[in-house]
């Protein structure tokens, strides 16, 4: 959603981002789930796994090439020269903030370790600094999904209220 905020050319009247990624480089270093940033961002098609992985002889630290850790090539890292990773980080939504002008509601769980709440707070702060009408809704006791019944009701109420405010 944050990428669309900077590229949509007035296609949308409003945006709602739930647990969105604002700064891809920051996200890479703060998520508790490294599979997605490593393999989705350029690592999967280039993954080289040391045959010792999973054995008592498995490597435990970085190899001499500087891009392998524990026998798995880190193709999706911000410091990777992998073309897919380079393009991915060049298109990080935080680099498009100067194009933001469409109202944005940011929703995030305060205990989300997959996409840390900092991503939502940073996007909200960027929208505020750009003068974009924006709202921040954080559920301090929820994680990546808003599952508690009362919180889910509030999530839906605020979601539709935001759309009603900007899309009529």
Which role does the model predict for each range below?
Residues 1-168:
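Active-site-proximal cap/loop segments of hydrolase catalytic domains
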């Amino acid at each position: 959603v944050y990428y669309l905020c900077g590229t949509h050319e007035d296609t949308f009247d409003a945006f709602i981002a739930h647990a969105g990624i604002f700064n891809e480089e920051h996200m890479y270093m703060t998520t508790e789930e490294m599979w997605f940033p490593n393999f989705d961002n350029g690592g999967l098609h280039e993954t080289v796994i040391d045959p010792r992985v999973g054995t008592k002889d498995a490597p435990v630290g970085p190899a001499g090439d500087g891009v392998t850790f524990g026998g798995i090539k880190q193709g999706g890292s911000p410091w990777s020269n992998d073309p897919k990773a380079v393009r991915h980080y060049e298109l990080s939504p935080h680099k498009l903030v100067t194009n933001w002008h469409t109202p944005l509601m940011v929703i995030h769980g305060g205990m989300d370790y997959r996409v840390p709440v900092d991503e939502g707070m940073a996007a909200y702060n960027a929208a505020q600094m750009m003068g974009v009408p924006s709202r921040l809704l954080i559920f301090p006791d929820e994680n990546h999904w808003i599952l508690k019944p009362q919180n889910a009701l509030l999530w839906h109420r605020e979601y539709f209220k935001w759309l009603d405010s900007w899309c009529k």
